[in-house]
């Protein structure tokens, strides 16, 4: 997972809860002042659907959860496994009370159901770390309850990385810290899985910004064609990630064949192994597209060139197209001094790994099956009516 040090303000609309007879509920979206995502590779370190709206600030997607009656907005992250939040009297909240007022913080003394387990937690990221102690409390997300949910409470400060609270929903061996497992345990959903859909980065704050995570169900209105279910591939070093095998091309340039790709919603960019990234740069040169360096490590180019940019990925026979429009990050969304005609490239050098973050994930609809160790993907669709299908058995292909 990764987060940025830049701060933006996004105006977000309120969304009313869906009618109960549809079998799903929506958490409201609100105006937030959030930290935007940036290049930071992590250390490798009633049985109905429950739908929580995600809100997009640049490309950092957040979801709201209530812990002991206290509302928290945290960045959703398939690349880590627990939720951690700021304690109300943490050094971070003392340094920047406005952010804690905006995103929320957790005060154990305000909840009669809060319990300090006395067990420490520590998560190392590419920049910084989060640590503290695990607590349990009653959680509510999208109107559904998960009693006794376990999460981390951080009393530290921003010097350890400067990122917002993180809602880890990745591969997890401890069911007590998995929100989807706890929703299943409480009878809110039948299957321990969730589907995710990300909107276009340019739609942040508009009525069309309808990113969502749906626990226990899929939304067939968010993809075109059929879903392809593929097994998760184990990674070395004991780390657990949503890793799958894929091949990739940029235009007519073959980048890689049958290599490991990590799907990580807590990462903004698409990172390619160095050799693959250099081949991509060569492909840009062939298209007469030149990247210019900007502060913060961003690489800019004219947005008018987006129509030339096209990736094709193959996942076990399922072909996914990622366009320049999918990959582009509006330059003036990151830096107000950048002209609106400039886009920042959403692909960068990943060193020895392929790490596919939000600039890839918004081109697909993805389903993460934690029970069966599988991922299902399809090409994303926009503008279709929502159609929620409760999953009690196999994910439909």
Swiss-Prot record:
Query: Which is one Gene Ontology cellular component term of this protein?
Result: fungal-type cell wall
Gene3D superfamilies named among the record's database cross-references? Acid Proteases (2.40.70.10)
Q: Which Pfam families match?
A: Asp
A single GO BP term for this record reads: proteolysis
Q: Name one GO molecular function term.
A: aspartic-type endopeptidase activity
Q: Which residues form the Peptidase A1 domain?
A: 61-378
Q: Which CDD domains match?
A: SAP_like (cd05474)
Q: Where in the cell is it found?
A: Secreted
Q: What is this protein called?
A: Acid extracellular protease
Give the gene symbol.
AXP1
């Amino acid at each position: 997972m990764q987060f940025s040090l830049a701060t933006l303000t996004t105006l977000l609309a309120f969304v009313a809860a869906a009618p109960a007879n549809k079998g799903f509920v929506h958490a409201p979206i609100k105006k937030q002042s959030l930290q935007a995502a940036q290049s930071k590779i992590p250390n490798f370190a009633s049985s109905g659907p429950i739908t929580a709206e995600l809100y997009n600030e640049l490309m950092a997607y957040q979801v709201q959860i209530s812990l002991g009656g206290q509302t928290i907005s945290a960045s959703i992250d398939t690349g880590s496994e627990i939720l951690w939040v700021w304690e109300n009297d943490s050094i971070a909240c003392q340094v920047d009370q406005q952010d804690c007022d905006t995103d929320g913080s957790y005060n154990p003394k305000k909840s009669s159901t809060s319990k300090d387990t006395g067990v420490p937690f520590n998560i190392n990221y590419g920049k910084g770390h989060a640590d503290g102690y695990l607590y349990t409390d009653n959680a509510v997300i999208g109107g559904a309850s998960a009693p006794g949910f376990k999460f981390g409470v951080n009393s530290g400060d921003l010097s350890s990385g400067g990122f917002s609270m993180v809602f880890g929903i990745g591969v997890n061996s401890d069911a007590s810290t998995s929100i989807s497992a706890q929703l299943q345990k409480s009878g809110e959903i039948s299957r321990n899985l969730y589907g995710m859909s990300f909107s276009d980065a340019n739609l942040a704050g508009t009525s069309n910004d309808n990113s969502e995570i749906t626990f226990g169900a899929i939304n067939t209105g968010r993809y075109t064609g059929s879903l392809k279910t593929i097994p998760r591939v184990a990674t070395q070093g004991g780390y657990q990630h949503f890793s799958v095998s894929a091949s990739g091309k940029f235009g007519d340039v073959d980048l890689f064949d049958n290599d490991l790709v990590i799907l990580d919603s807590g990462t903004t960019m698409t990172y390619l192994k160095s050799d693959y990234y250099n081949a991509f740069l060569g492909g840009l040169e062939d298209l007469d597209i030149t990247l210019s360096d900007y502060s913060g490590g961003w690489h800019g180019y004219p947005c008018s060139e987006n129509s030339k940019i096209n990736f094709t990925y193959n996942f076990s026979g399922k072909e996914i197209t990622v366009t320049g429009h999918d990959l582009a990050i509006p330059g003036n969304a990151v830096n107000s001094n950048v002209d609106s005609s400039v886009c920042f490239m959403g692909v960068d050098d990943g060193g020895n790994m392929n790490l596919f973050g939000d600039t890839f994930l918004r081109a697909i609809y993805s389903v993460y099956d934690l029970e069966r160790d599988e991922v299902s993907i399809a090409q994303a669709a926009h503008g279709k009516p929502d159609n929620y299908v409760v999953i009690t058995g196999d994910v439909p292909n």
